[in-house]
Design a protein with these regions (language model features):
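Helix-start (N-cap) detector for alpha-helical repeat units in TPR-like alpha-solenoids
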Residues: 447-448, 481-483, 517-521, 553-554
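Alpha-helical repeat scaffolds
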Residues: 467-470, 499-512
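Polytopic membrane enzymes that build or remodel cell-surface glycoconjugates and lipids
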Residues: 2-459, 463-490, 495
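TPR/Sel1-like alpha-solenoid repeat signature
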Residues: 450-457, 470, 484-491, 506, ...
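Structural marker of alpha-solenoid helical repeat scaffolds
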Residues: 442, 477, 513-515, 549
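Terminal, low-structured helical/coil segments at or just beyond the last alpha-helical repeat
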Residues: 550-571
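TPR/TPR-like (Sel1-like) alpha-helical repeat modules
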Residues: 475-476, 540-551
Length: 571
């Protein structure tokens, strides 16, 4: 039998081809998926500076509008603009094209991750098994926790900022390992900085870029083999660090403002939650991420926190698991330190790679991020396992068995099982109804998921009885004005006498002050009720106010037809 290392050397493209094939097998089905109600529409076809496609006016707006959607990500919005234009030109369904772009971005990131891990191992003078690195990259690429960022159009920002981060760090590594500071090295430095800026413009999470660049620098200085050249801190490198930290600081300010001054909502405090709640959330979220990496069960959209800002799955258990996992890793590193030179520096680097980009999402540095954790937040941090595999030397017996193929095949089967779970998990993201029905299966008391399921039942299958039941249950658990308006619209559509009376009770304040309904849904419901009762003048007033509502996001055709009918009746 040929050794696995021999097969690796047969062609340098074989590992990358295997990565591409695995990702496409698991995620290609996402191209046929529809939209998810959370953010997909608000970022794309209902976004006023995206829906009309690419134009300089729209580009200026996406750079200067810091409040839309609670996040500043101009480069990501520009890609959505291009999506709109491509869909119009080619006639391809918009959702299909957007999902295709997401899948291709994930393919690119998986390729770049494998490339970067091999490059850093080579730069460090490590001779570990390349097949172990490949298996780790496969594990990352097709793990069930990758489903959310790949199958959710709104998560384009995750893959874009990671794409530019990986590219930038590859250029940074090329600069650090250059033997001569010539024009090529300077070009690599400039490209690394450009990628840093681009990543920050895709999502503010990229503010961690200079810290990751510094981690690469320190790793090469402290953990490389003795015969490997150690990069110093040249004036060029220091200037680049300063520039990157300035960009990161500006991005952090923009992120804080966007999260606390969301368009259409009242401004909120940056540190609204008590510090001890933020600490509990951070530790329990880490526990969940560690647990889900091993046992990815119960993953779903919009994971919520229950009253008191504690995780649904129990803070104590998750915190205990997080602490136990970190202690176990430290114990293994301590025992392995003599058999694997550089193990400590490799583990410290991998730990920094995991913790630095995920820290802003944990809620410690501000209350945004305190209400939930999400699989998408681990998209870049989880790559730490690939770098750990590349930088740590395996025991000789494990290397031999990997080379013979026995251990490799066993591990590959395990990775394939995770890929199978990811394929199944992707099926829960077909559309908004399926995604939130899955959320209710995992968390039966999820009030926002009830609203989304109710929307689908009323709009798609006209099952108003079940849809209204979901709205009522959501209101009982968490009263919200927008849910009350949806309930009124569904009641008006069902059209019973008792339904009409309830709509008038629910919308009494809106009748007196129509400006309270920014989206026009309650106004439309009231107009429908007054129309059914023959009060044409009041119905006309309600329909006109509904059509003119500044935050209306749904089609106006049906409302206009009802308005025309009322006007015709008066004549």
């Amino acid at each position: 039998m040929k050794s696995m290392d021999g097969l690796w050397q047969m062609t340098k493209f074989r590992p990358y081809a295997l990565i591409v094939l695995a990702v496409l097998v698991v995620f290609a089905r996402a191209v046929g998926f529809s939209y998810i109600g959370l953010d997909d529409a608000g970022y794309t076809f209902r976004n006023p500076f995206v829906a009309t496609g690419f134009s300089w006016a729209n580009v200026v707006e996406c750079f200067t509008n810091f409040r839309h959607g609670g996040i500043w990500m101009p480069f990501t919005y520009i890609t959505y603009m291009i999506d709109m234009d491509v869909s119009r030109i080619t006639g391809m369904q918009l959702s299909a094209w957007m999902h295709l772009v997401n899948v291709l971005l994930h393919v690119l990131n998986a390729i770049l991750l494998l490339y970067l891990a091999r490059r850093i191992a080579s730069a460090m003078g490590r001779d570990g098994s390349p097949w172990l690195v490949l298996v780790a990259a496969l594990f990352w690429a097709i793990h069930p926790m990758r489903v959310e960022p790949v199958a959710w159009i709104a998560c384009r920002k995750e893959m874009l900022w990671v794409l530019f981060t990986l590219c930038g760090l590859a250029f940074w590594l090329k600069y650090l390992t250059a033997s001569v500071r010539n024009a090529t090295a300077k070009t690599s430095l400039i490209l690394a900085f450009i990628c840093c800026v681009a990543a920050c413009l895709c999502k503010p999470s990229a503010m961690c870029f200079p810290v990751l660049a510094g981690a690469f620098h320190l790793l090469l200085r402290s953990g490389a083999s003795e015969d490997v050249r150690k990069p110093g801190f040249s004036a060029q490198a220091i200037a680049c660090y300063i520039a990157m930290f300035v960009v990161a600081g500006g991005t952090a300010i923009a992120a804080a403002y966007s999260q606390t001054h969301v368009a259409g909502q009242e401004a909120v405090a940056l540190f609204a939650a008590p510090f001890h709640h933020r600490v509990v959330h951070a530790l329990s979220a880490l526990g969940f991420y560690f647990w889900a990496a091993v046992w990815p069960s119960g993953l779903h959209v919009d994971f919520r926190m229950v009253e008191g800002i504690l995780p649904q799955d129990g803070a104590a258990n998750l915190i205990a698991f997080a602490v136990a996992a970190m202690v176990a890793v430290l114990a293994v590193v301590y025992m392995w330190r003599k058999k694997s030179p550089g193990a400590i520096s490799a583990c410290l680097f991998s730990f920094a790679w995991f913790l630095v980009p995920i820290a802003p999402t944990l809620g410690l540095f501000g209350s945004f991020g305190i209400e939930a954790h999400a699989d998408r937040f681990t998209y870049l941090p989880a790559m730490a396992i690939v770098f750990l595999a590349a930088l740590c030397r395996m025991p000789d017996i494990a290397v031999k068995r990997f080379s013979d193929g026995a251990l490799f095949k066993t591990v590959l089967v395990v990775v394939a099982v995770y890929g199978g779970f990811a394929f199944r998990q992707a099926g829960f993201w077909r559309d908004d109804y399926t995604a939130h029905l899955r959320a209710l299966d995992c968390d039966p008391g999820h009030p926002r998921a009830m609203v989304h399921v109710g929307d689908a039942l009323c709009a798609r299958v006209k099952d108003f009885d079940r849809g209204i039941a979901f709205y009522r249950k959501s209101l009982a658990l968490r009263p919200r004005e927008y849910v009350k308006y949806r309930l009124a619209y569904a009641l008006a559509s069902r059209g019973g006498w008792e339904d009409r009376q309830e709509v008038k009770r629910l919308g009494a304040e809106v009748v007196r002050n129509p400006s309270l309904d920014q989206r026009g849904m309650m106004l439309d419901a009231l107009g429908t009720v007054y129309m059914a009762e023959g009060d044409w003048e009041t119905a006309i007033k309600m329909f006109k106010a509904s059509i003119a509502a500044p935050g209306r996001f749904w089609p106006k055709g049906a409302t206009k037809r009802k308005l025309d009918e009322c006007i015709e009746r008066i004549r």
